[in-house]
Structures are given as structure tokens and as C-alpha cells.
Design a protein with these regions (language model features):
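Terminal, intrinsically disordered low-complexity segments enriched in charged/polar
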Residues: 45, 51-68, 76-82, 89-92, ...
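Ligand-binding loop in jelly-roll beta-barrel domains
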Residues: 72-75, 83, 143-147, 156-180
């Protein structure tokens, strides 16, 4: 199945030497990741910051970003396109295992017996904004369906995403480096 969603457009602003604002880039993301074993799954890495407060004039280095985690004390913005999940549970597990091994080696992906194969933990606070379609957020004890316009705040929990809708879906994620220490 091909991706039926329109391409993501990334527009970046800047100030010139006189302080006048302009568009420094306008086009597709410079960092797009896909996994052959999961057709239609596309990660559009948009931007990242490496400090807080963020350095406004920091270089655009998103093309060097690897994994799921933001930089220490930083953030990462990505837009992910999700194909419908395959009906066969073994095929879904195969696809998700490939996704984690190729793209997200830094995610806590230590599955327990009976868990959804996409379960993972990150030490982050994530803002997940459903842009298109319908996705289901799965936790250890419950799940909920999210539609376009819904926002989920993920706070370091064991969780997974599944697309049971039969149609492509798109979510924007802002991951903020976090700590479980009080």
C-alpha cells in the first residue's frame, strides 16, 4: 500500500543581519526515514533543539538525528505517517520489530508476554497531536481512540500506537527530554 497522505512541508524562518525576518527554507523535510518491512510508515524529522532555553540561531542539524530520543535537555519534532496495521498479528510483530531495530534502537522496547508488539518507554514528555485519521493509544491497563484534532500527553509511560482504522493516519510528535527523578 502506498502512502495516501500529502507530503509534509517544512517552512523555517530566520532573521537577516538587519533583524528582518525571512523564510530560510520551504520544502520537504530534510530527514525522512522509512522501513522497507513496514510499507507506508514514514518518519518526517522536522526540527530539534539541543538546549533549554533553545538557541534561536542554532544550526539546522535535524538530518543528523538518529533514534527516537531528543538530545539531552532538548526536543525533537517529528511527523509520522502510519499505514493501517496488518490483520495478521505475526506480520504486525515482524513489521514493528523491524521498525524498532532500524529506527528506534534507543527506545525501551523490552516486551513482556502478551503485550502489544509496539510497546515502548522513553524518558520524555511527548505531545502527540493527531493531524489526520484515527489512531489508538495503548497503555498497559487501557487504550483510547484518538481522532484528528485530539492531543495526547505521554509522560514516560509504557505505550504503543496502533492504526486499526483501515486508512492512513498522521501524528505530529514533540518529544521533550525528561527525567523520572523528583
Amino acid at each position: 500500500m502506498h502512502n495516501e497522505l500529502p507530503p509534509v512541508r517544512r517552512v523555517v524562518t530566520e532573521n537577516d543581519k538587519n533583524g528582518k525576518s525571512f523564510f530560510v527554507s520551504d520544502g520537504p523535510p530534510t530527514s525522512i526515514r522509512e522501513v522497507a518491512e513496514r510499507p507506508g510508515y514514514r518518519v518526517n524529522n522536522i526540527w530539534r533543539t539541543s538546549a533549554s532555553p533553545a538557541l534561536i540561531k542554532a544550526a539546522d542539524d535535524i538530518h543528523t538525528h538518529q533514534g527516537i530520543m531528543p538530545p539531552k535537555n532538548g526536543t525533537v519534532l517529528r511527523i509520522i505517517d502510519y499505514p493501517p496495521d496488518p490483520q495478521d498479528p505475526l506480520e504486525l510483530k515482524k513489521q514493528l520489530d523491524a521498525m524498532f531495530s532500524h529506527l528506534y534502537k534507543d527506545a525501551g522496547h523490552d516486551l513482556k508476554e502478551g503485550e502489544h508488539p509496539g510497546m515502548h518507554i522513553t524518558e520524555t514528555v511527548d505531545y502527540a497531536i493527531v493531524l489526520f485519521g484515527q489512531m489508538t493509544a495503548i497503555l498497559e491497563s487501557e487504550e483510547t481512540v484518538l481522532n484528528a484534532g485530539d492531543v495526547l500527553i505521554q509522560r514516560g509511560t509504557n505505550h504503543a500506537w496502533t492504526n486499526r482504522s483501515g486508512k492512513p493516519a498522521r501524528i505530529a510528535f514533540i518529544l521533550i527530554d525528561g527525567s523520572n527523578q523528583e
